[in-house]
Amino acid sequence: LTTIAEPEAVELATKYILPEDHPYRVIASAGGETFLVYHLDEKGGIQNIHTGNKCASGTGEFFLQQLRRMDISLDEVAAMEIPETPLKVSSRCSVFCKSDCTHALNKGEEKASVIAGLSNMMSDKLIELFQTISMDHVLLVGGCAGNKAMAHFLRQKVRDLHIPDESHCFEALG
């Protein structure tokens, strides 16, 4: 099978699912292993790519590991109400983040608050990648786009956040 590089796949998927005159100049890819932000030019080509640090905290896989530790499924997370005030968790290191979650749960903190804290931290990780890019029109893709709490916290920070139906398979679509 022929393969293409991920940035090229992102360009092709964008052109496939969005109309030519779409306003989106930023694609935030929130995946299981990495978070990336693609800055698009006016023709939909990738102008720049910003990647996060290699720490696992804030990635989809880390989020899933924490859910397993709490014995909560993704379906249960999807049905949860998002607390107004999420637990503050460290975004600097997965060990510190895991420790914050463990201590909070041991002190009786609600699981929903811990999950909201993790989701808010994930949204902050993406925001850090925007650097000097406008956050006016952002397309959110990747498996983590299905995390409604993360999307909720991103919407508080981004003026126009769009999550396409194909977000979970966006790169593969390209």
PLM regions: where:
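Glycine-rich phosphate-binding loop plus the immediately following alpha-helix
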Residues: G45-P86, H168-E171
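Glycine-rich phosphate-binding loops at beta-strand->alpha-helix junctions
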Residues: F130-K157, H168-E171
